[in-house]
């Protein structure tokens, strides 16, 4: 998936060994741990061992969606910049981010909304959210909009990667995804980092972990 030298591979493997040793016991299944371990590798922050929540069907659903060439809808361009375009091309997956579109900016100003909310609404208007992987790494309002669309319009993404970072609504936006079951909503697979921590780097790490897991399974 990546152009990496033997030395680079050795350094990465050594890093993973250190993480495994220092992380100690955990309750994650093997494939789930490969996701969490890659998050820790990207951040050098072992807190993610405790704050990462992975839905029981998240890995399978994410890999199957990739195999089908699902749309990948992101809240910020930084996520797109971090993804491996060649690997996504193998799967036929297209990436989308509308946050800098002129109409999104104008609608946000006119409605006194946020660009993140309007970008998600635009994605929904193009029917890009059903059977998609939705990746939110920066904007809590985008994740809250996804939660609302699930409840009110019944959208069914294949996987939500909900890891927005921040002090305003980041914690609450992630909790809203967990609470969907209380609205008698069919459970949507998710990977979340609870609390304030998260970010685009985390989102990219999760997507790359899923791509690697898919390769290990022989899906591509």
Curated annotation (Swiss-Prot):
One Pfam family per UniProt: CbiC
Entry keywords, A to Z: Cobalamin biosynthesis, Isomerase
The keyword Manganese is assigned to this record: no
Pathway: Cofactor biosynthesis; adenosylcobalamin biosynthesis; cob(II)yrinate a,c-diamide from sirohydrochlorin (anaerobic route): step 9/10
MF annotations from Gene Ontology: cobalt-precorrin-8 methylmutase activity; precorrin-8X methylmutase activity
Catalytic activities: Co-precorrin-8X = cob(II)yrinate
GO biological process: cobalamin biosynthetic process
Active site: 41 (proton donor/acceptor)
InterPro entries listed in its UniProt record: Cbl_synth_CobH/CbiC, CobH/CbiC_sf
Assembly mode: Homodimer.
Family statement: Belongs to the CobH/CbiC family.
Protein name: Cobalt-precorrin-8 methylmutase
Gene name per UniProt: cbiC
């Amino acid at each position: 998936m990546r152009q990496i030298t033997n030395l680079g591979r050795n350094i990465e493997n050594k890093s993973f060994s250190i993480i495994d040793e220092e992380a100690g016991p955990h309750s994650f299944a093997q494939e789930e741990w490969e996701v969490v371990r890659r998050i820790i590798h990207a951040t050098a922050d072992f807190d993610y061992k405790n704050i990462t929540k992975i839905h029981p069907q998240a890995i399978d659903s994410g890999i199957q969606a990739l195999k089908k060439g699902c749309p990948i809808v992101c809240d910020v361009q930084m996520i797109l910049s971090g993804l491996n375009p060649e690997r996504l091309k193998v799967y036929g997956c297209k990436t989308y981010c509308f946050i800098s579109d002129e109409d999104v900016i104008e609608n946000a100003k006119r409605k006194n909304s946020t660009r993140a909310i309007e970008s998600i609404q635009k994605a929904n208007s193009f029917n890009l959210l059903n059977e998609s992987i939705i990746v939110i790494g920066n904007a809590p309002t985008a994740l809250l909009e996804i939660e609302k669309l699930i409840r009110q319009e019944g959208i069914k993404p294949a996987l939500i990667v909900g890891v927005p970072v921040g002090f305003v609504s980041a914690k609450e936006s992630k909790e809203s995804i967990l609470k969907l079951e209380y609205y008698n909503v069919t459970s949507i697979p998710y990977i979340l980092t609870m609390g304030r921590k998260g970010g685009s780097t985390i989102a990219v790490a999760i997507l790359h972990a899923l791509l690697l897991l898919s390769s290990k399974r022989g899906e591509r």
